[in-house]
Every structure is written in structure tokens, then in C-alpha cells.
Amino acid sequence: MDIRKTFLDYFQSKGHKLVPSSPLVPDDPTLMFTNAGMVQFKNIFTGEAPIPNPPRATSSQTCLRAGGKHNDLDNVGYTARHHTLFEMLGNFSFADYFKEDAIAYAWEFVTDEKYLDLPVEKIWVTVHDSDDEAYDIWKKYISEDRIMRFGDKDNFWQMGDTGPCGPCSEIFYDQGAEHFHSEEDVMGGEGDRFLEIWNLVFMQYERDEKGTLNPLPKPSIDTGMGLERVVAIKEGVFNNYHSSLFMPFLEKIGELVGKPYDFDAPNSASYRVIADHLRSVSFLLAQGVNFDKEGRGYVLRRIMRRAIRHGYLLGLREPFMYKLVDTLVDLMGKQYDYLASRAEAIKTSMKMEEERFFETIEAGIKLFNEELKNTQDVFNGEVAFKLYDTFGFPLDLTEDMLREKNIRLDIDAFNKKMEAQKAQSKANWKGTGDAATTGDFKLLKEEFNTNEFVGYETQEVTTKVLALLDENFKKTDAINGKGWVLLEKTPFYAESGGQVGDKGKLEIRNEKLEIRVLDTKKFLDMNLSEVEGKLSVGDEVKAVVDPSRVEIEKHHSATHLLHAGLRAILGDHIAQAGSLNDDKRLRFDFSHPKAMTAEEIEKVEAWVNDKISRAIPRKTEIMSVDEAKKAGAMALFGEKYGNEVRVVSMGDASIELCGGTHVDNTAQIGLFMITKESGVSAGVRRIEAICGRAAVEKVKALREELSQIKEEVKNQNPIAGIAKLKEQIKTLKSEVASAMSASQKELSTVNVNGVNVIVEEVQTGDIKSMIDDVKNKYDNVAVMLFQKKGDKVLLAAGSKNTPIKAGDWIKAIAPIVGGGGGGRPDFAQAGGKDASRITTALEEAKVYLSEILEGGN
């Protein structure tokens, strides 16, 4: 039985629209990862987005919980039901049906023989202790002795401190008293006997800033059912990891380890940890998240290194995780086709991270074990920091290792060592000043919903000022300075998809006033332009886009061709990881395991210029996401696409989902030049390039530089001129070396009580090198050299196997020439201001030597 398909088909038959799983990286600045099925519908529930048609949806959403409020990482592998990545089946009602239908649907799906067909006597439900309505509905289906009431902790759900919220009802499956005997194996306990399989959230209130619950005029439904748990129940196993969703991983790990998986073995948890983490790491990599030192990339690294460490415990000493990717593709590639298309890129990134950690893990574990010998109850926080900072052990990996030994960590000492270092993982992902969560954008959204973007067709339009916000994003009737404007129709493109926001001007009709448009951004699906000038609500204006848009479009279209060119030259594993397109340059980040060679860069550049020279018309079509995928369009994870998408193609060269503006024909791009290729992070490369006017300016600048080089080398063939100069430099270096050698040969050596002594003034050469050569030549020697530099003097001393200490010698002699200095016993140097005193200094240096070597001191 395909439970995922059965669930989705059931709710589609009930009028729900099938919505695809949204990315694990949500379009929400307050979340690090998508952790529930309702995340992609959040704006609908809060009223910031309109209710769709139909007003009900169903989905199978991949979710990740590895930090913050919902953090299952510590339990993964050690319990039967916890995972970092899991699939949440859900049905949603947006001000449509409510408790009666939600409970009826759930009961039918759980118990009807056409669907899950679970025994009625095994089903228990919970409701909020104040929710008599839900209690009375459930009485129609199940005996009252199996309806339990609990308080806010267990049966009340809220999105945040304020906003939509409400009681919830959870459906539990009793796995049988004969299998579970813990005190926690009761309803409401933490045991595994009563397994929660479905949560029905009744969003019927809105909590205000005072904490008061106000009834919503149109309540909604949000439900979530864990696919992994239901599959285990239907397959008659009492551990999610023993279901068909995980056993193939455990079997493959057994092959790699050389020991089959055995649940009763002491190390069985390590098999389960690896199986779970393989899924989450693969999905994150496939969706464009890369290993990093902070943010989402650091969470990815934590999960990966936790899995590697468990492989180490099983005896694995070389990369192994990447060898499990094919098993994942076999199991989940049909539902999530991007896993198959990006499998090689996933393997490459995994293997690189494994190689990196395997280089340090053994030394780190050795340090950990050594410190453990000196530990009774509390592990040294400074050592934990060293494991983190030097050996790449994430903090929670060290805590995981300590938990196995029942030892706690001195976290205060660890935090002190961290000091000003940036926190590597945060409970909540913080965006860059998300103004939409603090300003009056919601008021504009409620009043106007959206505004019309006409910038694809024209760069100039007569329109009206619908609303204004001041610099603090507060609604106002007029501005005289900086602020934000919402136009009824706008030709200004709002920053998104890597393309910068448009600039330009507003001209007020019948007035000789121009208002500068500084930037354009999107807030709650509204294009707002930042302006500077005097403007009032209701003003009729002429909106004109800055001519720089033409160059921006060239760079954006060139980016599409560059993406296609990289895939053509380097391979299909190339996936976009970020981009920037403005009027002067483009920047493109992409997944690739190593630096590009000069030959590869040249080939990609030539590929793009070839497509430009073919004058390929740009074509734009609106189609469904499925149609776009069938057409071969490349989509980006993290980008928010609606039911219909805009597909931009340039013949067979490039086809991508894109909302940006582009040239009409590739020939308009002009010359394309790659200016730099560099690394961004592990497995991510960056290309910087220019085209159009910027490329022409670059060629002019290079031509001028070439002219200057010709002038400097006095040769119209600069390559030949430079070669000649290099030969001259080589000759001069040889002459200098000969002069230095001759100078060294002229040094006069005197033997004083068996010690070779040299005290002289030299005219040329590097006196430090000379002293090194002298020390290499003799078994014992004391040497001091002086060299005149204009009115000043340099002096240096060396000693090898003699009673003379070079530092003391220099300190005694340097003041004679108006200087000071010092150094080691074997070498010291100084500078002096009075070169006229060199002769005196030479004599005093010899006297100093004689006194020591002849026993006078």
C-alpha cells in the first residue's frame, strides 16, 4: 500500500487541491527550516495572502527538525519515532470546513478498509480540556473512555506569541500493552505504546498582544500526519527504522561495516543515526544548502559530522556516507525527482566533507578520551572548545558523546572561550532586517492586496500613488524626503531572483517636480519603490525606469546562458547556489567540487559568446509547474513559485523558471567576459563576469593598459619587450650575486685562540646572508659586518660555537655609531645614524672580542 498516494488521493477526492512539498529552506525569515506542513500556508492563515480557490489543500511535506523549538536531533537513533527529516501528510482548510468535517475525514481515512483500515479498538484521541465541541463530535465515532482531555501543553497550538491559534485534537494508535511496559507507556506519557499519528489543529482564535483570545470570524484547519509512523504501523513493526522506508539503509550500512544490523546489538543506534542523517543531509544538499561555518550550512555540517562519528564507532575509517546515496534515490527518487538528477553532486559534496572530518576525527576522539580520564562528573569546557575550534567537532556532537558516558559539560567555560565568536547555530534564522514584520505593510496588504507590475511590457507608465510609507515603514498621507511608494501600476522591477531592484524617477503631472526612485523591493507580494522627494497619496505621476535597466537585463540573460554553459562544459551536477545581476556585472555561485581550470573557463566563455552571436530570440511563456518541468526548465530551490510559472527560454540553449526581465535577443547582450573564478565555501564556486557596455569599457581599459606597457618597455611587441626585460633582470641578478660572492671572498679571517674572527666593513650585498654563509663555512666563528647606507650604517653579528654572544656584542658596539639593537646569541643586528664613526666601531668591536677570547673579561 502506497500510504502517501492513498492519503493525497483521498483528500483530492474531497475537493482538496494537491500542493507540492515546499523547499526545506522556507520563504520565511523567522524560520531556519520548514518544520511543519503548514509553513507554506502561513501567510494564508495570518491573512497576509488571499484565500485560494479552492479553499482547501493537501500535501506531503518534507520537514526538518534539528534546532530551535522543534529539535529532535538528540533523540534520533535512540527512540523508535524521532527523525531529523520526515514527511508530514496534511490537509488544510482556509476558512472553509471546520471541526465536524476535519474529524469525519480523519476518522474515515484512519478506519475505513479502503484506506488505513486500522482497528477501531486501537484508536485513542485527545482534545483540549475546554473543547466540548470537539469532544461531542468524537463521541459519534469512538467510546468516551478513549477520549482524553489535556491542557494547553498537549492540546493547544499557536504560531507565535500573537496571531492565529487554537485547540488541537490528536489521534493515537495503541501498539499493545504486551510490547511496552514502561511507566511512561500511558496516554499522555512519553512512552512508545500510544503512538501519536495525526494532529488536527482547530485555528479558531487570534491571540492579541495582551494575550487575549479573540474568536476568528472564519476559522481554519491545519493537520499533520507522520508518514514514517503510519508506514511502521501498517507494516506491523514497532520501530520506524524497521519499516521499508529505512531497512534498505540499515542493510546497506551493514554491508559497509561488515556486520549486519542487529537491533539488540549495543551499537545498533549508530546504524539508525546514519540512516536518518543520510536522508536529511541528502535533501539539504539537493536543495542548495552547502556545508558552512554558520546558519543552515552549519546545521547541515552538524548532522553530517554526527553521522560520520557514528560510522567511526562502527569501525569505518574512510568516507562511506556518499555510498548510501544510490539507496536513497531508489527509495525516494520517484517522489522527489531532483534527488536523482543531483545524485552525483550530492555524493561529491558528501565525500569532500567526509574526507575533511576524517582527517581530524581520530585526533579529536583521542583528546576527548584523554580528558575523560581526568573527568568525574563535569567535562572541561575549554577542551570542548578545542574540539570545536581545532578538530571541527560541533558542540552538540561533544555533548552527544558525553551523554553516552552520563557526564555533563561545563558549558559556561565553553561559552567563555567562544567569547565574541559568532554563534554557529541559532534557534531561529534571522534575516537581514525583515522590515515586513515590523512596518505597516499588512495594512497596505489588507487595503490593496497587490499592485500591477507592467515592467515586462514598458519602462514608462502614467499611474497613481495608492499609498506611502515613511522611512520607518509607517503609513502616511505625504512625504517630503525619503519614503516608500505603492503605485497602482509600476514599471519598476522589485529585487528578486538575483536581479537588483529598479531605479528611476517619478514626474508629477502639471508640476516641474521629479522624485528620485532609489530602489524597488517586494513586500508581501507588493512592489514598493524607495523614493526621495515630495509626494502625496492620490498624486498622478509618470513613472520612468532608469536606462540602466537595459544593462541589467543583459547581465541577467547572460547569467542564464552562463548557467547552461557550465552544465554543458562541467556536467549536469551544476546547480545554482546564488546570483547577482546589476548594470555593471554579474555574479553566479554554483555547486562544483573544485576550482575550474583555465581551459574550462575559456570553454564556458566561448560557449556563452557562441550563443550570443547566434542572435537567439528570447521567448517567455506562462505555464504550470509540471509543464515547465516537462519542458526541461531549471527551477531554484528557495524560490517561491505559484501555480503558474514564467518560463524564459533562449532557443535550446537555456530554459529556466524566472520572473526577471531580459533582452529580446541574445545578440543584444554583446561581448561576454569572465573576470574571475573563485571559491565561496566547500563545494561552491563563484564566477564573476561582465557583458554589454561594461565589457566594452573593460576592453577599452585593457587596450589603454597595453598601450602603456608598450610605452614602458619601448617595444611595439610587448611580449617580446617583457621577455627582454626579464632576461636583463636575470643578468643583473647574476651580477649582484657575483658581486656579493666576491665581497664574501674578500672577507679577512683572523684566528684568535682557536676561534675564527671576522670584523669588517663591506660595500655591497646582504650582510645577513653573508653572515649565514660565513657560519656555514666555519665550524666556529665570530663575525661582525658593517655597511654604509648614505649617512647611516647597518651592522650585524653572528656567532657559532664561540663564547661570543652576538646580541651582547651588538648592544656594546651599536651606540658608537648612534644606534641600538640586539638579538639572539647566534645572530643580532642594529642600525646607526652616524656612518662617520664606522672606523672607531670596527676597532672597538675587535677590542670586545679580544677581551673575551683572550680571557680579559
Curated annotation (Swiss-Prot):
Domain notes: Consists of three domains; the N-terminal catalytic domain, the editing domain and the C-terminal C-Ala domain. The editing domain removes incorrectly charged amino acids, while the C-Ala domain, along with tRNA(Ala), serves as a bridge to cooperatively bring together the editing and aminoacylation centers thus stimulating deacylation of misacylated tRNAs.
Keyword tRNA-binding attached: yes
EC number: 6.1.1.7
Entry GO CC: cytosol
UniProt enzyme class: ligase
Cofactor: record remark: Binds 1 zinc ion per subunit.
Key words of the record: Aminoacyl-tRNA synthetase, ATP-binding, Cytoplasm, Ligase, Metal-binding, Nucleotide-binding, Protein biosynthesis, RNA-binding, tRNA-binding, Zinc
MF terms (GO), sorted A to Z: alanine-tRNA ligase activity; aminoacyl-tRNA deacylase activity; ATP binding; tRNA binding; zinc ion binding
Protein family membership: Belongs to the class-II aminoacyl-tRNA synthetase family.
Role summary: Catalyzes the attachment of alanine to tRNA(Ala) in a two-step reaction: alanine is first activated by ATP to form Ala-AMP and then transferred to the acceptor end of tRNA(Ala). Also edits incorrectly charged Ser-tRNA(Ala) and Gly-tRNA(Ala) via its editing domain.
Binding site for Zn(2+): 556, 560, 658, 662
Subcellular localization, as worded in the UniProt entry: Cytoplasm
GO biological-process terms attached to the record: alanyl-tRNA aminoacylation; negative regulation of DNA-templated transcription
Cofactor: Zn(2+)
Protein name: Alanine--tRNA ligase
Catalyzed chemical reaction(s): tRNA(Ala) + L-alanine + ATP = L-alanyl-tRNA(Ala) + AMP + diphosphate
Domain of life: Bacteria
SUPFAM superfamilies, per the entry: Class II aaRS and biotin synthetases, Putative anticodon-binding domain of alanyl-tRNA synthetase (AlaRS), ThrRS/AlaRS common domain, Translation proteins
InterPro entries the record matches: aa-tRNA-synth_II/BPL/LPL, Ala-tRNA-lgiase_IIc, Ala-tRNA-ligase_IIc_anticod-bd, Ala-tRNA-synth_IIc_core, Ala-tRNA-synth_IIc_N, Ala-tRNA_ligase, Ala_tRNA_ligase_euk/bac, DHHA1_dom
Chain segments annotated as coiled-coil in the UniProt record: none
